Amino acid sequence: VLFDRARSGCPGVIWWCGGAHRWCSFTVAGAVEQHGYDFIPESERYLSPRQLGFFWAGINSYQFFFVLGAGAIALGLSLVQAVVAVVIGNALFTLVAYSSIAGPRAGLPALTLSRAPFGVLGNRVNALFTWAMSLGFKTVNGLLGVFAVLALFERLGWHHPGAPGKVLATLVVLGVAIVIAVTGHRLLVRVQPFFALAIAVIFALLLCHTVGDVNWNWHPAHAPSGTGTIALVFSAAALVASGSLSYLVVSPDYARYLPSDTPVRKVFWRVLGGGAGMAVYLGVTGVLVATRTNLSDPVAGVEPLVPGWLYVLYIAACFLGSISNNASVFYSSGLAIQAISIPLKRWLATALDALLALVAVLLILFVYDFETALNDFLSLVNVWAGPFAAVWITDGVLRRWQYDAHAIHTSDASSRYWGLGGVNVRGIAAMACGMGTGLLTINSPLLHSWLSARLGGTDLSWFLPIVVSGAVYALLAGRRVRGEVRAG
């Protein structure tokens, strides 16, 4: 049976459907998703916990976590210390898994339900920050994919691709991700298991070919001691944690198609197992490989270690990983544009966002240094993302993830979530306290805080602001929110 474009609502998209029902259900992926940042009715919630777990494994199966693991070695840690930093940094994924519960319980994406603690207008600032952060990650992911395609061009004989090659590689990498994101949630969920399996196998082959020569006693030439070692471990953990923190602002987006009665433990363990498991696996692989070679170029740096056929597969894994993650980032970024109150449908917002991402990637390729841009960007993610997430998650726990779906989409003073002049001062104040804590405790290439210097360079900006913002919001708004829940 052919699922034609007239029935799919997606011009030009035709899917082959076999006899089995499970393949027939795939044809629905051909239709462009019409939902945006609105409520998902129970009748349209098709997702299963198992699919959600594979989804998270897929979006985390990209080179970024491999690069972060290698970065821990580059900071001057020993092999064991770098592995510890990777594990500690990814421990924040427990919060990502827990916050995903909001998806099925509320049926809303993060930037809709966060109107409750920040106010309808106040939350637009968070939507703008979310979009800006997603633009940064799309740029990083896109660049990793572009480097892979350029390496493939070299293997195919195009030894000096120059500007035309860079532009072509950028269009290919971003183009595939954009098509998936514009199509929507179902297609995202369907393709991620294939990305996860292919990339996991390729990195396993890479590990098998390199593990025999890993320097298990790796120590830097000038190893720090005492508080210096602790400071470096926490700095590396902060870089690794930026990946988990970035998901805290979008985690319900992907889980909101789960039925509302999905058991909490299934949501938590599927997200944790799929997402954190893949992130730790790739991060530790990056640590091990970095003891053997310089990975400042994360694609070409692997070439001397492996046979030609495996290097080509590694290039493919980097390319696929860039697409797998960027597709999901483009998806949530489109929701963020809607949450800013720009009157566009989700797929149009995503298409607009794609043009801006294209400009950003080309700007880094031709103007700025990638490594410097990456470090500066990651150092700033932690300052805002953690406090924002802490407030909306604390608010959700206080109200038991119960929201008035009509009122939360009302954009005037009649909404129960309007606040004072459209702003919930309690939520903004709690987030500001957390951000202030982050600025006081950060130690990064871009910012060196006073308190971090007094602590020997220890970076606490990746978890302490979360604790502060959550505690302050519970103190300021706890009684009021619980009263709203009791009043119905």
Q: Where are the regions that the model predicts?
A:
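Membrane-interface "cap" regions at the ends of multi-pass membrane proteins
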Residues: W16-L79, A231-A237, R256-V264, R480-G488
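Juxtamembrane transmembrane-helix boundary signature
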Residues: A85-P117, L128-G142, G478
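C-terminal membrane-solvent junction of multi-pass transporters and transport-like membrane proteins
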Residues: A198, F388-V472
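Hydrophobic transmembrane alpha-helices that form the core helical bundles
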Residues: N123-W158, S322-A339
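Hydrophobic, membrane-embedded alpha-helices of multi-pass small-molecule transporters
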Residues: L47-F65, L207-D213, A223-V289, G308-A327, ...
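Hydrophobic alpha-helical segments and their helix-loop junctions in multi-pass secondary transporters
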Residues: F147-L150, R155, L197-H222, V240-L245, ...
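Transmembrane alpha-helical segments of multi-pass small-molecule transport proteins
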Residues: A127, R155-T183, L197-C208, V240-S251, ...
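Membrane-water interface regions at transmembrane-helix termini and the short interhelical loops
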Residues: I73-L75, I101, P117, V125, ...
